[in-house]
């Protein structure tokens, strides 16, 4: 795996400014993977038909979702120069829509393949030109290049619109937003480029709110927030594992669903039912941990709930 993808760097301040630019975007509800739910693990509950479309074709259909304008322009990046493009090595990898049953008792960190399989059903969004090269942004202060991967498609669309307004040449190059599986992030290999995930601003706010409830008062959140609950444990084929959500709302709906399935009349959440973690830290723990702390984690794509009913494939 490319160690240049997730670790913190000196460019964190620039990323924080990017996140701040998106903080005023209005929240918009969307089921990002509705058209590919039939290809996902049966634990996911989304209403759909019996078709099983190719995951890339289905993800690409989300490009037509509504665009929103930035309230503040991203002024920290050069607008006088043509955008930098970088080709990403595929290494033969493809998008796979599935959730892997946890591997227990290995006594060491999970393999790259095992981690990639758990992320295969989670989409991220990037800016690309007609040659399938991804746009890089350069900070005026550092001069270094960043490849941005967005957790929310609308955020990628608004950045594309902003960059096109600053440099009309991008329109001639066929620049667009493309979707790829988060597992593909681990295959990105571009020398001298650091790839960073940009979280949804609403989920950053949710994470800060939950941390404040837990007694942690902080105005900043570094990384992509993910949400889990000790009250939600899934079981499949005599194994138990913990679902981790990229959206707090999906976790809350899953907790309510679990309460209903367990015939609890009052599914109201108690303080402390929701815990916040950093996605990048979990992935690092999966790679490096010598214990089984992370081998029961399953990542749930945005827009999906989970069922506590035992499921067998």
UniProtKB/Swiss-Prot annotation:
One of its GO terms (cellular component) is plastid. It comes from Arabidopsis thaliana (Mouse-ear cress). Pfam families: Tic22. InterPro entries: Tic22-like. Involved in protein precursor import into chloroplasts. It is a peripheral membrane protein. The lineage of its organism: Eukaryota, Viridiplantae, Streptophyta, Embryophyta, Tracheophyta. Belongs to the Tic22 family. It is found in: Plastid, Chloroplast intermembrane space. It comes from the Eukaryota. Residues 1-96 form a transit peptide. This is Protein TIC 22-like, chloroplastic.
